[in-house]
A protein has these predicted regions:
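Primarily a LysM-type cell-wall glycan-binding module
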Residues: 312-339
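Internal amphipathic alpha-helical segments of the cytochrome P450 catalytic fold
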Residues: 180, 234, 326-327, 337, ...
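Residue-level recognition of specific faces of alpha-helices
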Residues: 50, 103, 328-329, 339-342
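Short acidic, glycine/serine/threonine-rich helix-capping segments at coil-helix boundaries
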Residues: 342-351
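Catalytic-core regions of core metabolic enzymes
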Residues: 1-311, 315
């Protein structure tokens, strides 16, 4: 990707995470609907910008004036959340393009992940966006939040149960919205807060690397946690991992699609090409990232990195109970190339 394209993508990420005005297409009084719950969360956490509910069949939504279209608002809109059925997304994109929207967050599904017909519609939406200079997060995602802007467009039960966004130093970037929600719930149980969290879904436009690069440059983010199904630009991804290591920001990764069956599941989930796991593992470890097995370990390690100083090297002692734990520890730590110094001047203590 050319530097000018990367710069444009990073500007779009910054706009998405710190918008001045948001339109909610599909806004509803019903909290069981996406347009209802996400509008409620925007208000609940005290977003300081302008919020415009868009619903042509209502005058008021959640006590706020509703607009028949984005164009009818007549004011600049940075981000438009599209929470309408798939068959209405093309008209919604044309409306946003005519209104000069900068970034679209599309939570609607049934696009490239569902087959050729959905992929063709996704391509048409991307063409509309490119003609208008709009950028897309999604589709088939669950949204995002930025705790330091008190702004949430993430549909999550963990957020619905909390009175505030817990500010923290972990940037969470996930292709899976469901796993992002599960990690968020577990992290909140541990008292771990996030700088920002984003669910990317199909990555039709903005992708993992764009948000990873933003996290490296973001003063609020000290630890970066990733759930990755497929990477669009492998060379850029590995280069960013090296940059994160040089910046002193640990990158923790859960990688889906480790087996052939897992790769098929990934394709049907977010239309990602998972790639061969061993090659991925070798490259990311060499670049300084930490691969973990599941989202519970990802949250636990992120919590540890925010609370403990980074080690200065690979040498370090391990304390454990006698027996199996002590004999298994060297094998477990060998995968991360931890070296155990031999103890000196040690004497058994009589019992």
């Amino acid at each position: 990707m050319a530097p000018v394209e990367i710069a444009a993508s990073l500007q779009a990420v910054r706009t998405a995470l710190d918008p001045r005005a948001i339109a909610v297409l599909g806004a509803s009084d019903e909290l069981t609907k996406w347009g209802g719950s996400m509008l409620a969360l925007l208000r609940k956490f005290g977003f300081r910008g302008a919020v415009y509910p868009v619903n042509p069949r209502a005058d008021l939504v959640q006590g706020m004036k509703a607009w028949p279209s984005v164009q009818a608002i007549g004011q600049p809109v940075d981000v438009a959340l599209i929470a309408v059925p798939q068959q209405r997304t093309e008209a919604a994109f044309e409306d946003c393009a005519a209104a000069g929207v900068k970034v679209i967050l599309m939570v609607t599904s049934q696009f490239a992940e569902s087959g050729a017909e959905g992929a063709a519609l996704q391509d048409r939406l991307l063409a509309i966006a490119r003609r208008a200079g709009m950028r897309i997060i999604g589709p088939n995602c669950m949204g995002y939040f930025n705790s330091h802007a008190d702004m949430s467009l993430l549909n999550s039960q963990a957020l619905m149960r909390n009175d505030r966004l817990i500010k923290g130093e972990v940037a969470l970037i996930s292709q899976s919205g469901a796993l992002a929600g599960a990690m968020l719930a577990r992290a909140y149980d541990l008292g771990v807060g996030f700088s920002f969290c984003v669910s990317l879904g199909n990555q039709a436009d903005l992708e993992v690397c764009d948000f990873l690069e933003h996290a490296i440059d973001d003063a609020h983010s000290r630890v970066i946690a990733l759930y990755v199904e497929g990477v669009k630009d492998g060379a850029r991804f590995v280069d960013l991992l090296r940059r994160a290591r040089a910046a002193g920001k640990p990158v923790l990764i859960v990688k889906a699609g480790r087996t052939a069956l897992g790769q098929q599941a990934v394709q049907s989930h977010t239309a990602s090409l998972a790639g061969e796991f061993r090659a991925f593992e070798s490259q990311v470890r060499h670049a300084g990232a930490v691969l973990v097995d599941d989202f519970l370990e990802l949250v636990a390690q992120a919590a540890a990195w925010t609370r403990l100083p980074a080690p200065s090297g690979r040498r370090g002692p391990t304390w454990c109970a006698p027996g199996t734990r002590s004999t298994a520890s060297p094998s477990c730590t060998a995968s991360i190339r931890l070296r155990w110094p031999r103890p000196t001047n040690c004497h058994p203590r009589p019992r």
